[in-house]
């Protein structure tokens, strides 16, 4: 059976692993998931990620989650915004800020997947994929 929203599944796997303080989490790979993982790494929400080849064509992404010195969570929240049944698009002048700039919004734009800060700097809008804080 096919999955109706693979990005929501990706975010849910990260959220669940983070809640029980797992060191790593594996999820099926895709280009957009790799781009989201790169953004999470660049913004300091995860330590690293690796794309693991498997016998099937798809492969896996292995994410190394990041925690504070006393095992406190770095990712306190993940929320899927644009869903298959209700897409959410924003124009360049209305790109959202998450928690007044403490979190990030991940957008899919005509120039690729990027954070809200990068989209504001380039003055482009797009589809709001998720909020991370």
UniProtKB/Swiss-Prot annotation:
Listed name of the protein: Small ribosomal subunit protein uS8
Subunit and interaction comment: Part of the 30S ribosomal subunit. Contacts proteins S5 and S12.
The protein's role, per its UniProt record: One of the primary rRNA binding proteins, it binds directly to 16S rRNA central domain where it helps coordinate assembly of the platform of the 30S subunit.
Pfam families listed in its UniProt record: Ribosomal_S8
Family: Belongs to the universal ribosomal protein uS8 family.
Gene Ontology MF annotations: rRNA binding; structural constituent of ribosome
InterPro entries: Ribosomal_uS8 (IPR000630), Ribosomal_uS8_CS (IPR047863), Ribosomal_uS8_sf (IPR035987)
UniProt xrefs under PANTHER family: 40S RIBOSOMAL PROTEIN S15A
Domain of life assignment: Bacteria
NCBIfam families: PRK00136.1 (NF001109)
Keywords: Ribonucleoprotein, Ribosomal protein, RNA-binding, rRNA-binding
Cellular component, GO annotation: ribonucleoprotein complex; ribosome
GO biological process: translation
